[in-house]
C-alpha cells in the first residue's frame, strides 16, 4: 500500500475558498478604510480633493466615500463581487494617476508618490482577478445547489 499523497490529507477546496475570502478581505480593506475616512472627515477630505483640482469636492467626496464603503462590503461578502471589482478597477485606473502625480511631486515626495501609484496598480490587478475568476463559493447570493 502506498502512502497517501500530501495533498490528499489537506482539504484543498476549503483552503482555496479560505484563500479567496482572505484575498477579497485584503483587497476590500483599503476601500473600506478610505471610504470611512472620507465619511468621518468630510470637510478635510473635500478640502484635500479641492486642492487636487476636483470640482464640486464637497458634493463628490461623500459620494466617493459611500461608493468605496459599499464596494468594499460587496467585495468582502462576495455579493455581486465581480461588478464591485469592475467598478473599483475603473475607479483605481482613472483616479490613481490623477491623485498620485509623481511627475509633479517635489523631490522629497517623489518616491512616495510613485509607490502610491504602483500600489494602486497592484490593487487594479487584484480587481481584474476577481472580475475574471469570481469571488469563489463563499459568498452571499450564491445559488443553492
Where are the language model's segments positioned?
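Membrane-interface interhelical connector segments
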Residues: 40-56
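Extended, low-polarity transmembrane helix blocks
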Residues: 1-40, 57-145
Amino acid at each position: 500500500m502506498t502512502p497517501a499523497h500530501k495533498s490528499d490529507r489537506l482539504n484543498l477546496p476549503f483552503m482555496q475558498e479560505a484563500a479567496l475570502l482572505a484575498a477579497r478581505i485584503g483587497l476590500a480593506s483599503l476601500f473600506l478604510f478610505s471610504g470611512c475616512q472620507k465619511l468621518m472627515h468630510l470637510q478635510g477630505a473635500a478640502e484635500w480633493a479641492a486642492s487636487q483640482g476636483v470640482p464640486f469636492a464637497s458634493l463628490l467626496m461623500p459620494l466617493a466615500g459611500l461608493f468605496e464603503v459599499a464596494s468594499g462590503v460587496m467585495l468582502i461578502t462576495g455579493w455581486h463581487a465581480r461588478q464591485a471589482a469592475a467598478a473599483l478597477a475603473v475607479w483605481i485606473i482613472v483616479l490613481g494617476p490623477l491623485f498620485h502625480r509623481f511627475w509633479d511631486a517635489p523631490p522629497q515626495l517623489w518616491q512616495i508618490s510613485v509607490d502610491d501609484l504602483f500600489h494602486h496598480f497592484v490593487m487594479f490587478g487584484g480587481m481584474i482577478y476577481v472580475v475574471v475568476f469570481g469571488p469563489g463559493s463563499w459568498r452571499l447570493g450564491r445559488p443553492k445547489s
